[in-house]
Design a protein with these regions (language model features):
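Glycine-rich loops and low-complexity Gly/Arg-rich segments
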Residues: 69-71, 94-98
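Exposed extracellular interaction/assembly regions and N-terminal maturation sites
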Residues: 2-88, 112-125
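Residue-level detector of beta-strand structural context in well-folded domains
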Residues: 34, 96-98, 107
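Residue-level "contact hotspot" at macromolecular interaction interfaces
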Residues: 62, 99-100
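Extracellular beta-sheet repeat scaffolds used for adhesion and glycan interaction
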Residues: 86-96
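Sparse, context-dependent recognition of short Cys/His-centered cofactor- or disulfide-binding micro-motifs
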Residues: 54, 92-94, 101
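Extracellular disulfide-bonded cysteine-rich modules/repeats
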Residues: 102-113
Length: 125
C-alpha cells in the first residue's frame, strides 16, 4: 500500500483518503435490501425504513486490497446486525454475526480484494 510522502500533492493525499488509507467520515448509509455501498473509510449505518433491527449482509464499494473500513450505528435506538457470510452474495467474512446496537459500538473491516474481513469489534452494550 502506498504511503503519504512529504512531497505528495493535495490530490495525492485526497486519493489516500478516498481509498481508505486514512479514515475519512462519509455520509450516513441506510441499509437497502441488506446492503450498503461505502464511499469513504468511516460510515454510520442506519436501518432500512427506520426499523428497530436490520441485517447488513453485503458491503459494496471495496476498491483496493488493504482498504480499512469502520462502521458504527447511526441511531442508539436501532440495531444493525452485521451478518457473517450469510448468503451466496455476501461480501462479509467476519467469524460471527456482530450487532451494532449503541452509537458507541463499532466494527473495523479490511477489504481483501474479494471480501471484507473483521479486524476488530467493539461493543459498549
Amino acid at each position: 500500500m502506498a504511503q503519504i510522502k512529504s512531497y505528495d500533492t493535495f490530490q495525492n493525499v485526497k486519493d489516500h483518503i478516498q481509498k481508505g488509507r486514512i479514515l475519512s467520515k462519509g455520509a450516513t448509509l441506510t441499509i437497502a435490501s441488506g446492503a450498503i455501498t461505502v464511499t469513504d473509510s468511516f460510515h454510520l449505518v442506519a436501518t432500512e425504513g427506520a426499523a428497530d433491527t436490520d441485517d447488513l449482509t453485503t458491503i459494496n464499494g471495496g476498491t483496493q486490497a488493504g482498504q480499512i473500513l469502520v462502521l458504527m450505528a447511526a441511531d442508539d435506538g436501532d440495531t444493525v446486525v452485521v451478518k457473517n457470510n450469510s448468503d451466496p452474495g455476501s461480501t462479509l467474512e467476519i467469524g460471527a454475526h456482530f450487532s451494532l446496537d449503541t452509537e458507541d459500538d463499532s466494527i473495523t473491516l479490511m477489504w481483501t480484494g474479494t471480501k471484507w474481513i473483521a479486524l476488530s469489534t467493539h461493543s459498549n452494550s
